[in-house]
């Protein structure tokens, strides 16, 4: 029975209030609502979990033991559920071998393509390497006119331990009667064998060409014999001519024997194809060019090469500078403008100067001197493998080409350019037949990657360097590539990290997934995606304990009329106001000559003491500018140590009033189930002390540690403060039972008897932050209330004090970090805060609260810089830096800077176009 909808009955997981809701089948459905209202609980923890569980239940018990054990979610029943696929916004892999190409399977098809139709070219002459088969020789013979007399010859080599006479005797015994020597045929006779011959050929057969099948069969046998006797070589020559045609069944040219292409030759995960030096990683521990030339804006003359500074070592630099004119080396050109060949020359050296490679080798040879060991250690780091130059494959793999390009050349092209390469690829009919299916798969997958807005990535980009939004969209493209039908796709905010311009393409992808015959369910706050949805479910009305109900369900038009927060913001009845005036400030930081990744040597000024937003389409260079240049550069300026800094020339500006810089990302605040928001913001210590000071606690000699579930003392000994006991059931889901000893309250009975104003420690941990703030204010515990207040300000009032950090979303984790800074910010320190997409997972109403918190930080004298795509956030900024124009190689330029009003007037800026609509 196939129902028209998926019906969820009585969902009660987390804060869901026993809800029943129908989701139309084969439609694009958006689940929206405030952060913490229960959207993910419904979509992932109920619907997806049940879909997965039913699939696993259908397998044999033998297969089940190898799979994760799945709990049954708290729901009465789900009718009409389909197989479920969840695509979440986590960077899934930390494996350094995984690349965009391998995770989307495009690379697997490329390997096959090169193995099937790639041609091998000699690096010496550039000629194609071919090996001949018996058929090639037969075809060559058949091209002669009927009746032509030919000789089939095989070259003979004399082994070291034999004489010419012995070899000829052996040939005679094998039934051969003639040899060709110096263009004349000599007949072999037992008693009169020639003694001192060099370079002669054996006549394997004399043939008269006939164009019939019998002749071809006889000839093929003879050619086989000729190849055997000639150790892979043979010749044909007309009986009365002197010109010979050479054939070889060995894969060689220019004195090199080449490897025949097969799939493993192109795999860097296979020992056969991987570069032997770096094992296919592309980088090794060695001399790090970024440490040797830390400032690429300097020229060799200006001491760009750090190890060659100072009195002792400057001799090496002087050698190069004084002799540079002899080999035309530009010593006054900045390092970043040098060609790859010129940089390689500095490494390799020549007869006029010692290169860096030999310079460091000398140091290694004399490493018994302590100063040499120190110098070597200073310039060591992870660096590109010098053997394969980061291409990961053994050099033989790059001799194989299609249309002049090796597989390494192709994976270094942005996906958009790769698509053009395959569109313009000219193949012979035979190659077309062999490669037809492979090309179809490659082109489809590349198209999907372009459709989800990732056309700027290259296939050799490592998976662990992608942002959460990028890796989610790669998973989405991979799912599209597999073209499943009749499934249920559940996506967690696919618009994260996407500029509004790219969201339109994403909507196209979601619709094509739906049109294949799938139900696409998206947890989303983006207005454009809601407009495109067939059906919207709004969960609310508020968050936490005040949420968990379906407050509206229907089309976009129906939602506009609904009396819910989502409806009010969408219809304009509620709105995030544009600030009355924009701040200005004399303090600023300027980065001069930014050229890391795709940045085009730009100068960028970040004003301080205000809200600055960095925008631009996906892949335009925002993260590079802020995460790889600004953040580590300021850390270094303030002597805070820090990460490796990307490439730029210098830092200028008025920023000496800053005492520190904080990068607030979306990584979880704690993996342990015992970690919770109040331990992170250091409020739990005060609460434990408060309980330890109660009369009963003093009588029982309890200290504050007795009120912690992380150390022995007061916590329940049976469940170790977890509140539940896990029983492993071999083939079924682990059963989580409430601990019988403490009844799920985590503490010993005698600890729970200690009360403060009618609440014990367990009651308090189950109180929401909103209620706890009111409770502590009422009982004059203002210190604790003040510490909890920032959590309320950032919109986390719905979270309970003891909620496990492992259940928080990325957006919630980021806001807890923000709250911890807000609670600390009474100090006189001036801090620069950098946020990476803080609106992730936020409803319009939550964005409003977040903006208030950020404005509060700025009012306290701090500076805030944000990477953001959300137009509500951008329009509230004091200053906007827009990068572009496109992503990848076409990005990295400064398109516009100024107030949001100035950006909106800029004709070139994509961001401006979407700001106008606001």
Regions found by a protein language model. Name each.
Residues 1-918:
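Conserved phosphate-binding elements of NTP-dependent enzyme cores
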């Amino acid at each position: 029975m196939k129902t028209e909808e998926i019906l969820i009955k009585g969902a009660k997981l987390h804060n869901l209030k026993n809800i029943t809701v129908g989701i139309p089948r084969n439609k694009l459905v958006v689940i929206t609502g405030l952060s913490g209202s229960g959207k993910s609980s419904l979509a992932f923890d109920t619907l997806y979990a049940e879909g997965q569980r039913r699939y696993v239940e259908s397998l044999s018990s033998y297969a089940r033991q190898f799979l994760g054990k799945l709990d049954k979610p708290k729901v009465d029943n789900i009718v009409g559920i389909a197989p479920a696929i969840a695509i979440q916004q986590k960077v899934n892999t930390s494996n350094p071998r995984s690349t965009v190409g391998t995770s989307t399977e495009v690379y697997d098809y490329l390997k096959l393509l090169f193995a099937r139709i790639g041609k091998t070219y000699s690096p010496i002459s550039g000629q194609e390497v071919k090996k001949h088969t018996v058929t090639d020789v037969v075809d060559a013979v058949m091209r002669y006119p009927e009746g032509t007399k030919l000789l089939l010859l095989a070259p003979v080599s004399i082994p070291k331990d034999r004489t010419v006479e012995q070899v000829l005797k052996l040939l005679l015994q094998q039934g051969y009667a003639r040899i060709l020597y110096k263009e004349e045929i000599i007949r072999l006779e037992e008693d009169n064998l020639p003694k001192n011959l060099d370079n002669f050929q054996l006549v394997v057969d004399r043939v008269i060409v006939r164009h019939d099948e019998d002749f071809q069969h006889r000839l093929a046998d003879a050619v086989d014999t000729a190849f055997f006797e000639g150790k892979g070589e043979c010749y044909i020559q007309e009986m009365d001519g002197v010109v010979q045609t050479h054939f070889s069944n060995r894969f060689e040219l220019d004195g090199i024997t080449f490897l025949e292409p097969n799939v493993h030759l192109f795999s860097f995960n296979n020992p056969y194809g991987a570069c032997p030096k770096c094992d296919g990683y592309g980088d090794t521990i060695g001399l790090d060019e970024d440490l040797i030339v830390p400032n690429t804006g300097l020229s060799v003359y200006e001491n760009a090469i750090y190890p060659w500074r100072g009195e002792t070592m400057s001799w090496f630099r002087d050698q190069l500078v004084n002799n540079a004119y002899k080999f035309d080396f530009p010593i006054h050109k900045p390092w970043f403008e040098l060609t790859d060949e010129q940089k390689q020359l500095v490494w390799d050296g020549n007869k006029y100067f010692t290169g860096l490679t030999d310079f460091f080798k000398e140091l290694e040879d004399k490493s018994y001197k302590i100063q040499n060991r120190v110098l070597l250690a200073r310039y060591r780091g992870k660096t590109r493998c010098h053997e394969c130059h980061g291409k990961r494959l053994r050099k033989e793999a790059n001799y194989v080409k299609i249309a002049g390009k090796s597989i390494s050349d192709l994976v270094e092209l942005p996906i958009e350019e790769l698509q053009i390469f395959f569109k313009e690829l000219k193949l012979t009919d035979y190659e077309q037949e062999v490669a037809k299916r492979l090309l179809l798969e490659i082109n489809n997958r590349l198209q999907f990657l372009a459709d989800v807005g990732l056309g700027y990535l290259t296939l050799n980009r490592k998976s662990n360097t992608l942002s959460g939004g990028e890796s989610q969209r790669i998973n989405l493209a991979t799912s599209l590539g597999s073209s499943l039908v009749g499934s249920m796709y559940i996506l967690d905010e696919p618009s994260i990290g996407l500029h509004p311009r790219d969201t339109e393409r994403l909507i196209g992808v979601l619709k094509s997934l739906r049109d294949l015959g799938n139900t696409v369910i998206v947890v989303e706050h983006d207005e454009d995606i809601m407009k495109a949805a067939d059906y919207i479910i709004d969960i609310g009305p508020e968050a936490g304990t005040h949420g968990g109900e379906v407050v509206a369900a229907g089309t976009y038009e129906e939602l506009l009329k609904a009396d819910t927060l989502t409806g009010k913001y969408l219809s304009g009845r509620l709105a995030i106001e544009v600030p009355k005036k924009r701040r200005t400030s004399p303090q600023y930081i300027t980065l001069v000559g930014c050229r890391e990744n795709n940045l085009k040597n730009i100068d960028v000024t970040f004003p301080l003491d205000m809200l600055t937003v960095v925008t631009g389409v996906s892949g335009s260079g925002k993260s590079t500018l802020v995460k790889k240049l600004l953040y580590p550069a300021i850390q270094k300026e303030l002597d805070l140590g820090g990460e490796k800094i990307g490439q730029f020339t210098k830092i200028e500006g008025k920023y000496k009033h800053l005492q520190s810089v904080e990068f607030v990302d979306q990584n979880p605040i704690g993996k342990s189930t015992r970690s919770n928001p109040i331990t992170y913001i250091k409020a739990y210590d005060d609460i434990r002390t408060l309980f330890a000071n109660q009369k009963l606690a003093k009588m029982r000699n309890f200290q504050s540690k007795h009120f912690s579930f992380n150390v022995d003392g007061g916590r329940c000994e049976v469940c170790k403060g977890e509140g539940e006991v896990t029983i492993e059931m071999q083939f079924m889901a682990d059963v989580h039972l409430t601990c019988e000893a403490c009844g799920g309250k985590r503490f010993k009975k005698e600890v729970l008897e200690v009360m403060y104003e009618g609440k014990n420690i367990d009651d308090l941990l189950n109180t929401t932050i909103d209620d706890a703030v009111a409770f502590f204010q009422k009982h004059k515990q203002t210190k604790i209330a003040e510490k909890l207040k920032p959590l309320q300000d950032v919109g986390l009032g719905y979270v309970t004090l003891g909620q496990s950090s492992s259940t928080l979303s990325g957006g919630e984790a980021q806001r807890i970090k923000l709250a911890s800074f807000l609670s600390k910010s009474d100090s006189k320190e001036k801090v620069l805060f950098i946020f990476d997409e803080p609106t992730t997972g936020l409803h319009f109403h939550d964005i409003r609260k977040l903006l208030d918190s950020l404005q509060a930080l700025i009012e306290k004298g701090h500076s805030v810089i944000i990477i953001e795509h959300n137009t509500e956030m951008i329009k509230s900024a004091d200053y906007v830096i827009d990068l572009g124009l496109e992503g990848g190689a076409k990005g990295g330029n400064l398109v516009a800077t100024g107030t949001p009003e100035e950006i909106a007037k800029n004709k070139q800026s994509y961001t401006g176009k979407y700001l106008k609509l606001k």
